[in-house]
Amino acid sequence: MGKIIGITGGIASGKSTVTNFLREQGFQVVDADAVVHQLQKPGNRLYQLLVQHFGQKIILENGELNRPLLASLIFSNPEEREWSKQTQGEIIREELAALRDQLAQTETVFFMDIPLLFEQDYSAWFDETWLVYVDRDVQVERFMKRDHLSKEVAESRLAAQWSLEKKKDLASHVLDNNGSRDQLVAQVVKLLEGGDSCARD
């Protein structure tokens, strides 16, 4: 069975820089967000579940899900958020487990990019976990710039998630992305070669 490494981070922490680099190096990277996106396409498992739960109002004219509306329905209501975490979470876990088992047959090392890796107890799946970390003020600034948000909105969305500080204590390796892309990639190369990344505090 192959070595499995979990990669996680936070909004705008720079996780995609790491996963894109790994793919360029020829590694297989399972993208949990892409798996969810696929499951939410018309007719697929999450699509059916969500329409059954929220009704026709979440379907656009072209048959796709109205993702912004869905996000606001789920994130504005703690009960809906809990429902989503449990029900969608179970289906997502099944799909990711199937992909993991499939790749473990053929790959010596592969990666799984899971945004809620620690929050949803995926840690036990992995031989190592890598956290892409940035300081909070850098994260807010990058998030505002990336999604054209006000500081207030960016702060409130980040507040709804576990902080990167909290995740830092749980990860086996921390990739510091407060600097440039090249500095981040250099840390990834070091880990691939078997060294540690930046020093853990």
Enumerate the predicted regions with their spans.
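Small-molecule kinase domains that catalyze NTP-dependent phosphoryl transfer to phosphate-bearing small molecules
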Residues: 96, 103, 124-125, 145, ...
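Well-ordered beta-strand positions
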Residues: 28, 34, 128, 172-173
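Generic C-terminal helix-cap and adjacent flexible tail
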Residues: 193-201
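An amphipathic alpha-helix signature
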Residues: 47, 51, 136-141, 151, ...
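Walker A (P-loop) phosphate-binding motif
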Residues: 1-34
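Residue-level signal for inorganic ion chemistry
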Residues: 14, 33, 84, 111, ...
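ATP-dependent NMP and nucleoside kinases share a basic, alpha-helical "lid"
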Residues: 97-104, 109-145
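ATP-dependent small-molecule kinase phosphotransfer cores
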Residues: 37-108
